[in-house]
Amino acid sequence: MEEMKVTKFPEGFLWGSASAAYQIEGGWREDGKGITNWDQFVRIPGKTYKATTGDVAVDHYHRYKEDIALMAEMGLKTYRFSVSWARIYPEGRGEVNPKGIEFYENIIDECLKYGIEPMVTIYHWDLPQALVDLYGGWESEEIIEDYVNYAKTLFKAYGSKVKYWITFNEQNIFTSLGWLTAQHPPGKFDDQKTFYQVNHHVFMAHAKAVLAYREMGGTGKIGASFAYTPSYALDCKPENVMSKHDYDELKNFWWMDVYAYGRYPKAAMNYLRKKGFAPVVTKDDQKILKAAAAEIDFMGVNYYQSCVCEYNPMDGVTPYGTMNTTGVKGSAQVLGVPGIYKNPGNPYLMTTDWDWSIDPVGLRYCCREITSRYDLPIIISENGLGAFDKKTEDHKIHDEYRIDYLREHLKELGKAIEEGCEVLAYCTWSFTDLLSWLNGYQKRYGFVYVDREEEEGATLDRYKKDSFYWYQDVIKQDGENPVSYTHLTLP
């Protein structure tokens, strides 16, 4: 395709930013909220950076009006946030907590007051611990009906005000880190059989929630958000090209095909059957998945990096090794699946301090792949740069590196739209700084700096970074040729 300038984004394009309940709210035991799996997991020694918790987080629970006013000042068109299941149902089921319903209604109303479209994520990893204690959480198919009941409660409470619903955030990530690497709850290691069955339970919960939304007369848009890591073959050696294909089958299409087609990729399922890892899928399940696939309105994409695929011999690297959770650049190990693929670094790309490749073209690749394979509209539900931001003595945060990162990604997203991809929204991760699940508060993503570190007791005051003013300008210009940092006018 020929080189092009970035023209204005489509009329009605939703310029947004995102967050997650556990990472920002705090108020972990206030107003009747139940305990979540994360409230318990972070209290296990060694599980989080410097034993950080979300007990207070960045105190959005008490400061949401201040935060949403800043969003309005920036000019956001949409705010993507998640609901904490345990705030609505403290025990995961049973009695609804009216204070929980009221809190999220207040957030929705505050957004609408400023003309900001609320985009609601139903599940962003924080599960009522009561359901884990009762039947094992996602390991039991019993959770499907509890999740659907919870989702229906949200549809009933907020359906007249919310037009965009995301059933699950990054199903591929919370299940992988929970049942394969033990880095997320329930902290299980290499439990592949359970991992795939858990994923099937999540798929069924997603599908039944989508169908319930339609049965209840929901006319908004609904789908799931997937952490998409596009892959490149190391070279044109056939073994490496096949490793890329196998990677996509097992790491990308295994999820997206179910959302969009209602079926699992055949080659991946055959492989899992041979290994004894394939989930139990009934004919009724297949019908429900297929019916829901016909009802989703978009594919949500959380994009941070791409990867390289190379054939991995049987005695090669495994999926389990050191992941960089400290920000010490170069500490991550090459991982892979013996006999299939490994993911070496890309010599053509820079990396973040957490060893994530920086690849703006990869975002365009994602959009093109989804458009060609699924012919679905796209919501970029997360994209952003985690970095060590520093506040100067006069309370300025000069994050030109974040501006450069987002600017280059938006240029490629604009090209994807010019090439025929239907993109509805772009949500950065994140609006304010927040708790990074494994990296504490040192890994900052926001346009708004929050005065806190790993230790409690800071002011939690908010300060606008340089990137705040840059994104404000992008929104005013509807994304047309976003300016570089050197051309940015700062107050």
What would you call each of these model-derived segments?
Residues 485-491:
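Conserved small/polar residues in nucleotide/adenosyl-binding loops
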Residues 2-48, 91-93, 101-484:
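Active-site region of glycoside hydrolase catalytic domains
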Residues 63-83:
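Catalytic domains of carbohydrate-active enzymes, especially glycoside hydrolases
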